[in-house]
Swiss-Prot record:
Protein name in UniProt: Protein AE7-like 1
Disulfide bonds: none
Gene3D superfamilies: 6.10.250.1280, Fe-S cluster assembly (FSCA) (3.30.300.130)
Stated role: May play a role in chromosome segregation through establishment of sister chromatid cohesion. Unable to complement ae7 mutants, and thus probably not involved in the cytosolic iron-sulfur assembly (CIA) pathway.
PANTHER family in the cross-refs: CYTOSOLIC IRON-SULFUR ASSEMBLY COMPONENT 2B-RELATED, PROTEIN AE7-LIKE 1
Length: 154
């Protein structure tokens, strides 16, 4: 966590108890948006002791799945427009999905349109394979990502 808070007063919503699955939740031919959301909703924010779900950084509506093209799109909304943690949040989302999904899915992670001052730059970095690999090989960044994904504080 950072010493000086970037967003000292985030809006926090109550954590949902559980998600209701559709009837086809056990299908063998792919994943659905609710399943993907369930994977990422409990990731802890890098700055606050709240989940991405509680801060409304991610929502059920922010996940799109195209099984025909084996593509998943997650859009996330930083709590402030100048959020310096946007890249870390995106790395957390990507690392968690890499752990949970089969390799054949193409995952795009983007900040919601108009939600970040450096939207184009952040989106480019989060979807550049070489940059993502290099970032996750950095021990300090990897430790922060792992703390957010595997946090016991939640």
């Amino acid at each position: 966590m950072t010493l000086g808070l970037i967003n000292a007063n985030p809006v926090v919503q109550a954590k949902k108890e559980g998600l209701v699955r559709r009837e086809d939740q056990y299908r063998d031919d792919g994943v659905d948006p609710l399943e993907i959301y369930d994977y990422v909703r409990d990731i802890r924010d890098p700055e606050h002791p709240y989940t991405l779900e509680q801060l409304r950084v991610v929502s059920e509506e922010s996940v799109t799945v195209d099984d025909k093209l084996d593509r998943i799109l997650i859009t996330f909304t930083p709590t402030i427009q100048h959020c310096s943690m946007a890249n870390i949040i995106g790395l957390c989302l990507r690392a968690k999905l890499k752990e949970c999904l089969q390799l054949h899915y193409k995952v795009d992670i983007r900040v919601s349109p108009g939600s970040h001052a450096d939207e184009v730059s952040v989106n480019k970095q989060l979807n550049d394979k070489e940059r993502v690999v290099a970032a996750l090989e950095n021990p300090n960044l990897r430790q922060l990502v792992d703390e957010c994904i595997y946090s016991d504080e939640i």
